[in-house]
Amino acid sequence: MRTPRRHCRRIAVLAAVSIAATVVAGCSSGSKPSGGPLPDAKPLVEEATAQTKALKSAHMVLTVNGKIPGLSLKTLSGDLTTNPTAATGNVKLTLGGSDIDADFVVFDGILYATLTPNQWSDFGPAADIYDPAQVLNPDTGLANVLANFADAKAEGRDTINGQNTIRISGKVSAQAVNQIAPPFNATQPVPATVWIQETGDHQLAQAQLDRGSGNSVQMTLSKWGEKVQVTKPPVS
């Protein structure tokens, strides 16, 4: 039988994980490849929008820089797929002054997590808590962030996970930000930066939403379109 204290702790942790997952850091490099004049930013954002809308799988890494009220996450890393919808990964967060490291799996619509090390628990339908694969939802996920990216301006070249990218600054509508990152509670356009492959498919390599005062959420995508295999974990 679950004790009330343990049950409450599970609910609190799962809430933190679900909030973290809605916002999907990046493994970025400070190097800046040399090159000629910077390309026009708007076409790159449009290309990345189309690519991200069509994306069915990817590896996602998220880091919270600074502090954002309602978000106890430190990092989240996972492989996501929408065909079929599934996810597997790890989340690190701070709750009640304690550091928590938990693995999670979404399989056949059910969310599993190891709130106790090496012990998988069934938390029921992922849709009732959060399905991390919805980060790839073309209507509310990262594709929607790009579709609502305004005032795009190419700022420079950076290498992200070995990819040569163009760093583009701009602003994202409050509605798009709140759909992917509810803790922002944005009421006006949010300053943002995206890193898009300069050549090739122009995939989105990284995105950052800034909340001010050095606080931000930074998201990285890689392994675009690669097969993601998720297996059902053994439940204790």
Swiss-Prot record:
This is Lipoarabinomannan carrier protein LprG. GO terms for molecular function: glycolipid binding; phosphatidylinositol binding. It is a lipid-anchor. Induction: Part of the lprG-Rv1410c operon. Disulfide bonds: none annotated. Bacterial LAM blocks host cell phagosome-lysosome fusion and is one way in which M.tuberculosis evades the host immune system. GO terms for cellular component: bacterial extracellular vesicle; cell surface; cytosol; peptidoglycan-based cell wall; plasma membrane. InterPro entries: LolA/LolB/LppX, LppX/LprAFG. CDD domains: LppX-like. GO terms for biological process: lipid transport; response to antibiotic. A lipid is attached at residue 27 (S-diacylglycerol cysteine). The lineage of its organism: Bacteria, Bacillati, Actinomycetota, Actinomycetes, Mycobacteriales. The keyword Secreted applies. Modified by Lgt on Cys-27 with an S-linked diacylglyceral, signal peptide is removed by LspA, Cys-27 is further modifed with a fatty acid on its amino group by Lnt yielding a triacylated protein. Probably glycosylated, which is required for T-cell activation. The keyword Amino-acid biosynthesis does not apply. Residues 1-26 form the signal peptide. Belongs to the LppX/LprAFG lipoprotein family. Its main location: membrane. It is found in: Cell inner membrane; Secreted, Cell wall; Secreted; Cell surface. Residues 81-100, 141-160, 218-236 are annotated as: Prevents bacterial uptake by a human macrophage-like cell line. Keywords: Antibiotic resistance, Cell inner membrane, Cell membrane, Cell wall, Glycoprotein, Lipid transport, Lipid-binding, Lipoprotein, Membrane, Palmitate, Secreted, Signal, Transport, Virulence. A lipid is attached at residue 27 (N-palmitoyl cysteine). Helps membrane protein Rv1410c (P55) transport triacylglycerides (TAG) across the inner cell membrane into the periplasm; TAG probably regulates lipid metabolism and growth regulation and plays a structural role in the outer membrane. Binds TAG in its hydrophobic cavity and transfers it between lipid bilayers, probably to the outer membrane in vivo. Binds di- and triacylated phosphatidyl-myo-inositol mannosides (PIMs), and glycolipid lipoglycan modulins lipoarabinomannan (LAM) and lipomannan (LM), facilitating their recognition by TLR2. A host TLR2 agonist (toll-like receptor), shown experimentally for human and mouse. Inhibits primary human macrophage MHC-II Ag processing via TLR2. Both lipidated and nonlipidated protein act as TLR2 agonists in antigen-presenting cells, although lipidated protein is more efficient. In resting human CD4+ T-cells lipidated but not nonlipidated protein is a costimulatory ligand (with anti-CD3 and anti-CD28) for T-cell proliferation and IFN-gamma and IL-2 production, leading to increased expression of early T-cell activation markers, TLR2 and NFKB3 phosphorylation.
